[in-house]
Amino acid sequence: MDGKLRADEVAVTKSILKSTFNMWMDIIDVDVVIIGAGPSGLTAAKYLAQNGVKTVVLERHLSFGGGTWGGGMGFPNIVVEKPADEILREAGIKLDEVDGEDELFTADSVEVPAKLGVAAIDAGAKILTGIVVEDLILKEDKIAGVVIQSYAIEKAGLHIDPLTISAKYVIDSTGHDASAVHTLARKNKDLGIEVPGEKSMWAEKGENSLTRNTREIFPGLYVCGMAANAYHAGYRMGAIFGGMYLSGKKCAEMILEKLENK
């Protein structure tokens, strides 16, 4: 071996096009589409995929993890509490005990999304970045999939028609915006859906309401993470993430139960 690298331009292009075509053909009809690759979305993806559920995660940005990367006000740590710490430990994430706080741990705000994303991918979930969900497929009073567009095309303001992905269930894990639910409410006012938005910060109340607010809010459409609190007017929490991970896990468990009973 002389160490010379092959770099034929056309071969590179052909390889990308063939691989991309095969990938899209495989994911245009799935069990679950998760909108938003933040902490709750990645957690839901991991638990769904490791149970054999065909899962696609769509993220508008070119990286997954949502707001985790920035830690608290840019300081590179987040806080997680019991029992949510077990979710991170399963993904091989190192946790440090907090002096004087028996149930609180800190974690590296870069390590957490990196390893949680890899855990979801290794479980079998497909994560696509640079894709925005601009609408939902609504058939016979049930959500049946998502309408997707390139985020670059959307940002450029170009009028180009979108494509679609069919799904048995859709999860809105878009965070504070609850963008999928907002879109459903705005475009289908006859459904009577309202999104009051989240309240101001009350960390303990917000954390404890997250799993309670995680549910199917319309046939085929679930909310988890901060989208759940935004839909139910729950409190925000700041840089403590345990409720987010527990919300994602609960959402996955609810859908798994639905799929098993079908």
Swiss-Prot record:
Q: Which residues bind NAD(+)?
A: 40, 59-60, 67, 133, 159-161, 179, 226
Q: Keyword NAD: yes or no?
A: yes
Q: Under the GO molecular function aspect, what terms does this record hold? A: iron ion binding; pentosyltransferase activity
> Which EC number(s) are documented for this chain?
2.4.2.59
Entry-linked Pfam families: Thi4
Residues annotated to bind glycine: 236
Q: Identify the pathway.
A: Cofactor biosynthesis; thiamine diphosphate biosynthesis
Q: Keyword Transferase: yes or no?
A: yes
Q: Which SUPFAM superfamilies match?
A: FAD/NAD(P)-binding domain
Name the UniProt key words of this record, in alphabetical order. Answer: Iron, Metal-binding, NAD, Thiamine biosynthesis, Transferase
Q: Name what cofactor the protein needs.
A: Fe(2+)
Catalytic activity line of the entry: hydrogen sulfide + glycine + NAD(+) = ADP-5-ethyl-4-methylthiazole-2-carboxylate + nicotinamide + 3 H2O + H(+)
* Residues annotated as binding Fe cation: 161, 176
Q: What does this protein do?
A: Involved in the biosynthesis of the thiazole moiety of thiamine. Catalyzes the conversion of NAD and glycine to adenosine diphosphate 5-(2-hydroxyethyl)-4-methylthiazole-2-carboxylate (ADT), an adenylated thiazole intermediate, using free sulfide as a source of sulfur.
Family, similarity comment = Belongs to the THI4 family.
Fetch the NCBIfam families from UniProt. sulfide-dependent adenosine diphosphate thiazole synthase (TIGR00292)
Q: What is this protein called?
A: Thiamine thiazole synthase
